[in-house]
């Protein structure tokens, strides 16, 4: 595989940044993911980090160096992250469960597969056209697609999500794929801090007209400017697909990797490759969360410095 990646996360006017993102890959498959911890619930930064760690751990365990069923993997790994959040809340005796949205894209062969829960989005741009976008799990999006079937009153809060990881009910996970990729196709994963103040057409224009190293920072800065002093955190992870074989001209090429090689930018945890996250004992969960909290503390101290 050959691809290039650029990612930026900026704290807006919120007390802390609860967005997390990263990617990992083997010789023949790549996983890109972003999660947005939800405000109004405890420890959103733990929720987003734990969801990504679970996803990455299962990818490392199962991808040898490909996955037999990418869509099934995405669905099961995202639901496993949900179960981890419920177990964490029980272990900590929390009154409420930490919650997060998530969007993840898997590249395998020459095809893309993706899944999401909540309102973190994926955009796919080919040339200067928006080819695909995820649909938010919000009542606003639901009204747009089902307005004739499910009318909603004016007082209804359309921005409320009807599903996320960590919620009491089973999460809704939408999956898409396979979608055959062409060289030059670009995928963008983002939190609602971006699309909440920057339109789909603006995202498409920037992504199609500039290199990722220019378009991603500009989109983030535009979102912060448009959002003002109380704007949400803005996180963006973008990937440009170059193809399956050959040398990468801009970023990462995996063809020379061994079958057992696994690389990741997602913070490592105690989630072993030979253990299902749903089968971890309480001591392992405790150690995992301790690692997360220590990393968050170090990150906070670094930003203050």
Where are these regions (language model features)?
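PP2C/PPM-type serine/threonine phosphatase catalytic domain
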Residues: 1-305
């Amino acid at each position: 595989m050959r691809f290039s990646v650029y990612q930026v996360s900026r704290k807006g006017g919120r007390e802390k940044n609860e967005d997390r993102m990263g990617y990992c890959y083997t010789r023949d498959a790549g996983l890109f993911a972003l999660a947005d911890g939800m405000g109004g619930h405890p420890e959103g930064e733990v929720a987003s980090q734990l969801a990504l760690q679970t996803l990455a751990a299962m990818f490392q365990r199962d991808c040898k160096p490909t996955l037999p069923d990418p869509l099934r993997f995405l669905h099961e790994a995202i639901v496993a992250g949900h179960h981890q959040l419920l177990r964490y809340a029980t272990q900590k005796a929390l009154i409420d469960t930490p919650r997060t949205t998530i969007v993840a894209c898997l590249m395998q062969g020459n095809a893309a597969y993706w899944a999401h829960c909540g309102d973190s989005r994926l955009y796919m741009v080919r040339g200067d056209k928006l080819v695909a976008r995820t649909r938010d799990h919000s009542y606003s999006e639901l009204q747009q697609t089902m307005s004739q079937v499910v009318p909603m009153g004016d007082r209804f809060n359309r921005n409320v999500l009807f599903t996320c990881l960590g919620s009491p009910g089973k999460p809704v996970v939408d999956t898409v794929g396979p979608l055959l990729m062409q060289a030059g196709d670009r995928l963008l994963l983002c939190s609602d801090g971006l699309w909440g103040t920057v339109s789909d057409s603006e995202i498409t224009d920037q992504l199609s007209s500039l290199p990722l190293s220019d378009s991603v920072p500009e989109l983030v800065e535009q979102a912060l400017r448009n959002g003002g002093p109380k704007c949400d955190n803005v996180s963006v992870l973008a990937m440009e697909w170059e193809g399956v074989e050959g040398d990468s001209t801009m970023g990462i090429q995996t063809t020379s990797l061994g079958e057992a090689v696994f690389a990741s930018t997602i913070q490592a945890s105690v989630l072993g490759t030979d253990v299902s996250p749903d089968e971890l004992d309480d001591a392992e969960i405790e150690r995992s969360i301790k690692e997360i909290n220590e990393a968050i503390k170090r990150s906070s101290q670094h930003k203050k410095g």
